[in-house]
């Protein structure tokens, strides 16, 4: 199926290598946080729908930070997919998948990256025409060994593992041929965001990018 996505899931994955998973409670933090991450070399940003401010945060970044590739996380149904697209998201990431969500993603205007944690779920997503997936929760679902094993029968499928990813293990994931990027929350610690310590966040981003460049 040909999808009418403005930005493909392949484009999103290739702009990695690290995707910060952002839980932003106050919209006033949205723009400076996005700019701090971009200053550190990270353009792909995932704003999770875990706070009441999430849609406003996405809208603010989409409007005021044109260099950002802004997406929404924790998208679990077709209604939310439509809402984040209307807010300006360029892609949506789900922790799982349903038939309704996969169908809505195929018909929508932004890239949908479904979540899987098993081969059966992966095969279901492939049946709907998807090739790029979130592997979640990564560490709890077998981690590096699990993704490596999945790559055997499905060598053309790409993953972005999220869940338990940290500065101490993200390079292990990125070294796998079927992993294009990794998602993590360590790039924007709550205390740094609340304090407006944007220099610290920029430095964390620079460190993550530099580490990945060595692979």
UniProtKB/Swiss-Prot annotation:
This protein's UniProt keywords: Carbohydrate metabolism, Lyase, Schiff base
Entry annotated with the keyword Lipid metabolism: no
UniProt GO molecular function: 2-dehydro-3-deoxy-phosphogluconate aldolase activity
Record: active site: 46 (proton acceptor), 134 (schiff-base intermediate with substrate)
Chemical reaction(s) catalysed: 2-dehydro-3-deoxy-6-phospho-D-gluconate = D-glyceraldehyde 3-phosphate + pyruvate
Record-linked SUPFAM superfamilies: Aldolase
Pfam families on file: Aldolase
Site (Plays a major role in determining the stereoselectivity): 162
Binding positions (pyruvate): 50, 74, 134
EC code(s) of this entry: 4.1.2.14
Pathways per UniProt: Carbohydrate acid metabolism; 2-dehydro-3-deoxy-D-gluconate degradation; D-glyceraldehyde 3-phosphate and pyruvate from 2-dehydro-3-deoxy-D-gluconate: step 2/2
InterPro entries: Aldlse_KDPG_KHG (IPR000887), Aldolase_TIM (IPR013785), KDPG/KHG_AS_1 (IPR031337), KDPG/KHG_AS_2 (IPR031338)
Cited Gene3D superfamilies: Aldolase class I
Protein family per UniProt: Belongs to the KHG/KDPG aldolase family.
Subunit comment: Homotrimer.
Function: Involved in the degradation of glucose via the Entner-Doudoroff pathway. Catalyzes the reversible, stereospecific retro-aldol cleavage of 2-keto-3-deoxy-6-phosphogluconate (KDPG) to pyruvate and D-glyceraldehyde-3-phosphate. Involved in the degradation of 3,6-anhydro-L-galactose (L-AnG), which is the major monomeric sugar of red macroalgae. The cleavage of KDPG to glyceraldehyde 3-phosphate and pyruvate is the sixth step of this pathway.
Designated name of the protein: 2-dehydro-3-deoxy-phosphogluconate aldolase
Organism field: Pseudoalteromonas atlantica (strain T6c / ATCC BAA-1087)
Taxonomic classification: Bacteria, Pseudomonadati, Pseudomonadota, Gammaproteobacteria, Alteromonadales
């Amino acid at each position: 199926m040909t999808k009418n996505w403005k930005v493909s899931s392949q484009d999103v994955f290739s702009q990695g290598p690290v995707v910060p998973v952002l839980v932003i409670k106050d919209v006033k933090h949205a723009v400076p946080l996005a700019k701090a991450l971009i200053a550190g070399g990270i353009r792909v940003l995932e704003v999770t729908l875990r706070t009441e401010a999430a849609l406003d945060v996405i809208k603010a970044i989409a409007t005021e930070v044109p260099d950002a590739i802004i997406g929404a996380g924790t998208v679990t149904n077709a209604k939310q997919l439509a809402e984040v697209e209307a807010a300006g998201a360029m892609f949506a990431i789900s922790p799982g998948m349903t038939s309704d969500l996969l169908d809505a993603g195929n018909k929508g205007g932004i890239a949908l990256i479904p979540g899987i944690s098993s081969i059966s779920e992966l095969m279901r997503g492939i049946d709907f025409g998807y090739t790029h997936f979130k592997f979640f929760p990564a560490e709890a679902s077998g981690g590096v060994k699990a993704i490596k094993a999945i790559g055997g029968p499905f060598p053309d499928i790409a993953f972005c593992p999220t869940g338990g990813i940290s500065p101490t293990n993200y390079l292990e994931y990125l070294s796998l041929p079927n992993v294009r990027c990794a998602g993590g929350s360590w790039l924007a610690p709550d205390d740094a965001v609340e304090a407006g310590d944007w220099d610290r966040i920029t430095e964390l981003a620079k460190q993550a990018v530099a580490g990945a460049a060595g692979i």
